[in-house]
Amino acid sequence: MHTVQKDTTFTKIFVGGLPYHTTDSSLRKYFEVFGDIEEAVVITDRQTGKSRGYGFVTMADRAAAERACKDPNPIIDGRKANVNLAYLGAKPRSIQTGFTIGVQQLHPAFIQRPFGLTPHYVYPQAIIQPSVVIPTPVQSIASPYIDYTAASQAYSQYTTAAYDQYPYAASPAAGFVGYGYTGAVQPPITASTPAAPATAFVQYQPQQLQPDRMQ
């Protein structure tokens, strides 16, 4: 006679980012305050017996599992962990303002486009004169993060080898694309190569700006 397996879709919790000294008992001790626990296990390496940095906890009911996943910054054994329902996988770590180091935000006067300029033309202050406009690739003018390479590097300090081995957790850092300032280079003109038209740049003098447009 076969035993019917209990559905643990909404009660089984994935716990990532665990310290390597975390054990089954210490993991259980953290989650028992949220309700009854059916199982708490830390995944270990078969050869070395050392923790892989993540584990699973199965709560007795759905309400207890929801309470356990509410804390956005759970601290287990002195380290910030990643707690979420197992079928959803690891929670993605959102980019905070701490990753904007070295990124200069745009002045609102340049975002409003009063002179018909496209969002791809911005003024990098302290780099060139205000009267010169250079083409700069910007993914989203509403986003304060222009240099995604810096954000990717800052994010990498939170990733561990344990997440690479966990099937639910994809590497979020791979989704960032680096953007930077690029200059247009015109190829040399030869007898066999026709002359390419010069790149058009939009330019206007700063004295044409009205004071009310810079507010």
Swiss-Prot record:
Residues 11-88 form the RRM domain. One of its GO terms (molecular function) is mRNA 3'-UTR binding. Keywords: Cytoplasm, Differentiation, mRNA processing, mRNA splicing, Nucleus, RNA-binding. Transmembrane segments: none annotated. It is found in: Cytoplasm, Cytosol; Nucleus. PROSITE patterns: RRM. InterPro entries: Nucleotide-bd_a/b_plait_sf (IPR012677), RBD_domain_sf (IPR035979), RNA-binding_reg (IPR050886), RRM_dom (IPR000504). GO terms for biological process: cell differentiation; mRNA processing; regulation of RNA splicing; RNA splicing. One of its GO terms (cellular component) is nucleus. It holds the Pfam family RRM_1. The keyword Transport does not apply. The keyword Phosphoprotein does not apply. PANTHER family: GEO13361P1-RELATED, RNA-BINDING PROTEIN 38. RNA-binding protein that specifically bind the 3'-UTR of some transcripts, leading to maintain their stability. Also acts as a mRNA splicing factor. May play a role in myogenic differentiation. Belongs to the RBM38 family. This is RNA-binding protein 38.
